């Protein structure tokens, strides 16, 4: 399973990398089962090109919940179109490990 992310922001960063690398197993393990959709977890043809963390509330090593607001940049590999998505993600601890619950477009 690997080492648990110490903060919600660390989990956010690792999940972005998992989306970019299409690591479905990692995304599955770090998604709260109550809110986890069926795979695949990405849009085919999307290449993730950057992540900028805008802020985090709580989500520290001693917290049980936290939020991370970020902007992720993407490119459509077929058309070359580029764009960004902004999200405020909610995280919580489950069995002592941070998991992603849900996100809202910010």
Label every PLM stretch briefly:
Residues 1, 23-25, 63, 76, ...:
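Acidic-enriched, low-complexity/disordered segments with a strong bias for Aspartate over Glutamate
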Residues 1-44:
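Core segments of small alpha/beta cavity-forming domains
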Residues 31, 48-50, 98:
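Tryptophan-centered motif/residue detector
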Residues 32-36, 56-62, 95:
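Rieske [2Fe-2S] iron-sulfur-binding subdomain
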Residues 43-84:
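Surface-exposed, charged secondary-structure patches
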Residues 83-106:
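Short beta-strand edge/turn micro-motifs at domain boundaries
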């Amino acid at each position: 399973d690997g080492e648990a992310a110490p903060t919600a922001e660390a989990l956010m960063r690792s999940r972005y990398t998992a989306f970019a690398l299409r690591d479905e197993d990692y995304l599955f393990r770090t998604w709260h089962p109550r809110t986890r959709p069926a795979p695949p977890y990405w849009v085919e043809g999307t290449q993730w090109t950057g992540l900028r963390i805008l802020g985090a509330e709580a989500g520290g090593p001693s917290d049980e919940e936290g939020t991370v607001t970020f902007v992720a940049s993407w490119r459509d590999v077929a058309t070359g179109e580029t764009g960004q998505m902004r999200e405020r993600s909610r995280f919580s601890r489950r069995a002592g490990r941070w998991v992603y619950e849900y996100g809202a477009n910010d």
